[in-house]
């Protein structure tokens, strides 16, 4: 691709209402898996001023204190005062949790074949490219890093007037398919009422943005919109209702790749919405790292109760060194994409999910689906 273009992605902070919900959902999932790895969990959360509602379907032998887990997540994020409209000590925590439908369970846990079927029908996408060292699209990768830097500045006291809710949007200019310049940075952060707008703008630009983005990408043409409304005191659940699963593009590739529609947080790995999306990322990343293509998007689909994928699709956007059909043959040879195969390969029946609920599910080496363990075998095909 030789044309010049711009592309935009956004990220949100751990104090964003939707991300509060995601973190609570995954913290509850982790607590259950720590006691009962075979549990079936679909945990949904709603947060609003002074209230958290936890719902969903959970079938488990474990007992966890949902209220205590919820309060500790909110405390860790930093909502510790009723002046913010949300306080971990005084908020109400309501529960509306049921069990998994036996009709679903009989398809997932096939007692005759002992084969784990997919938890639902659905389609999942995985993506990787060479534009960053973590094989992620640059706009979403750097947007996440901006939000991480902001959280560190808030929690360390470096910028004591920061509050938990924030979001940023990053537009990068591309030439020949690679990022070369920052076109626009949009940055909105909740703050205490006693900080002057001009002081906030300077601090965010100098101490957050310029410390994260490559200096060679910034110039006098770069546009900055920092708290462009001028005031962001009311935020978090006081400002907006938050729900689990409403930041699926933030969680994945920032819009650079397609999305099957299913969210991740609060779901145990029998749900292919989550586990197969992780597997698809693993496949795509290894394909790119092995040199089979510079970009790779993979689609997998499943039928409920059926173990093998119903389809696999690959697009390398004209960058492939092999035919797409040949890459699909390699996928069938080197990757087990049944639900049980995915769970076993990535050791997914562990309490590892809360850390995924902020700053994206991809691009961090601590996640098992980010391993480059198939590169040697795949590269033999070249």
Curated annotation (Swiss-Prot):
Binds 2 divalent ions per subunit. Binds 1 potassium ion per subunit. ATP binds at residues 16, 165-167, 231-232, 240, 246-247, 267. Pathway: Amino-acid biosynthesis; S-adenosyl-L-methionine biosynthesis; S-adenosyl-L-methionine from L-methionine: step 1/1. InterPro entries: ADOMET_SYNTHASE_CS, S-AdoMet_synt_C, S-AdoMet_synt_central, S-AdoMet_synt_N, S-AdoMet_synthetase, S-AdoMet_synthetase_sfam. GO terms for biological process: one-carbon metabolic process; S-adenosylmethionine biosynthetic process. It holds the Pfam family S-AdoMet_synt_N. It catalyses: L-methionine + ATP + H2O = S-adenosyl-L-methionine + phosphate + diphosphate. NCBIfam families: metK. This is S-adenosylmethionine synthase.
């Amino acid at each position: 691709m030789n044309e010049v273009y711009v592309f935009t992605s956004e990220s949100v902070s751990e104090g964003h209402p939707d991300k509060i919900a995601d973190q609570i959902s995954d913290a509850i999932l982790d607590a259950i898996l720590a006691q009962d790895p075979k549990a079936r969990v679909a945990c949904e959360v709603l947060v609003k001023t002074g209230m958290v509602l936890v719902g969903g379907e959970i079938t488990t032998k474990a007992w966890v204190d949902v209220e205590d887990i919820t309060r500790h997540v909110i405390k860790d994020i930093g909502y510790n005062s009723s002046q913010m409209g949300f306080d971990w000590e005084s908020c109400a925590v309501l529960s509306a949790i049921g069990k998994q439908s036996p009709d679903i369970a009989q398809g997932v846990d096939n007692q005759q074949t002992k084969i784990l079927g997919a938890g639902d029908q659905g389609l999942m996408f995985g993506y990787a490219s060479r534009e960053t060292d973590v094989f992620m699209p640059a706009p979403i990768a750097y947007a996440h890093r901006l939000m991480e830097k902001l959280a560190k500045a808030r929690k360390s006291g470096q910028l004591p007037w920061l509050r938990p809710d924030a979001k940023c949007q990053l537009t990068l200019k591309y030439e020949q398919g690679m990022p070369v310049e920052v076109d626009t940075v949009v940055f909105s952060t909740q703050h205490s009422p006693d900080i002057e707008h001009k002081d906030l703008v300077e601090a965010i630009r100098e101490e957050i943005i310029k410390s994260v983005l490559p200096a060679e990408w910034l110039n006098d043409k770069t546009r900055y919109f920092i708290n462009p409304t001028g005031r962001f005191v009311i935020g978090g659940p006081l400002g907006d209702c938050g729900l689990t699963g409403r930041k699926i593009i933030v969680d994945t590739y920032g819009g650079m790749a397609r999305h099957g529609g299913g969210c991740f947080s609060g779901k145990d790995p029998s749900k292919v919405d989550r586990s197969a999306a992780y597997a698809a990322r693993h496949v795509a990343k290894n394909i790119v790292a092995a040199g089979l293509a510079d970009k790779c998007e993979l689609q997998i689909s499943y039928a409920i109760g059926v173990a093998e994928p119903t389809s696999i699709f690959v697009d390398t956007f004209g960058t492939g060194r092999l035919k797409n059909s040949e890459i699909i043959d390699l996928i069938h040879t080197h990757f087990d994409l049944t639900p049980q195969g995915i769970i076993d390969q990535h050791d997914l029946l562990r309490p590892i999910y809360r850390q995924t609920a902020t700053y994206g599910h991809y691009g961090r080496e601590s996640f098992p689906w980010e391993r480059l363990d198939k590169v040697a075998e795949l590269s033999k095909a070249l």
